[in-house]
């Protein structure tokens, strides 16, 4: 439905998981309806496990396993390091390095990114940065981001 109204991509979070398992039936149906290229799956990770429903429920699914099993349902992942979200103390670079080796899909990283240096490190890994608190608080400025942006 959203694609019909010209949404370019759809982000699927908790719906990708059901009863502490990957919701393959839902994802397969969605992929058939709108195409893999329009789907981004949110990977909210806390202590190496997928969390859902506003980060309140731990599925027990290892983050690396989720990436492996979900890769063919989507074209991108939105990875959030829940422990780092909003703290502006850096994201989970080690986990992102592992995940990047597991998938050819695009990875967008959120949670804790707070410096131009970190954005450059993520870029070298082939990971996009999603910024929130660092922009909101003024720790990162748009004018500085423009200097390193490639668009």
Task: Give the role of each language-model region.
Residues 24-43, 88-115:
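Alpha-helix-loop-beta-strand connector modules within alpha/beta enzyme cores
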Residues 14, 87, 112-113, 133:
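Gly/Ser/Thr-rich helix-start
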Residues 1-9, 94-129, 145:
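Catalytic cores of alpha/beta
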Residues 3-85:
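Conserved anion-binding
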Residues 21-34, 100, 123-151:
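C-terminal helical cap(s) of enzyme catalytic domains, especially alpha/beta-barrels
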Residues 85, 114-117, 137:
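Active-site environment of divalent metal-dependent phosphoester hydrolases
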Residues 22-23, 51-54, 88-91, 119-120, ...:
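Short, well-ordered secondary-structure micro-motifs
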């Amino acid at each position: 439905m959203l694609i019909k109204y010209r949404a370019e991509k759809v982000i699927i979070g908790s719906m990708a998981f059901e009863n502490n398992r990957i919701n393959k039936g839902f994802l397969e149906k969605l992929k058939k309806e709108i195409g893999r290229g329009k789907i981004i799956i949110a990977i909210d990770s806390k202590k190496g496990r997928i969390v859902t429903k506003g980060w309140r429920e731990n599925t027990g699914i290892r983050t690396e396993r989720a990436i492996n099993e979900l890769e063919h349902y989507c074209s991108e992942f939105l990875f959030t390091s829940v422990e780092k979200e909003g703290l502006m103390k850096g994201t989970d670079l080690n986990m992102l390095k592992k995940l990047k080796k597991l998938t050819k899909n695009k990875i967008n990283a959120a949670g804790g990114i707070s410096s131009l240096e970190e954005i450059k490190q993520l870029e070298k890994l082939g990971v996009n940065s999603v910024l929130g608190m660092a922009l909101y608080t003024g720790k990162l400025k748009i004018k500085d981001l423009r200097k390193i942006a490639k668009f």
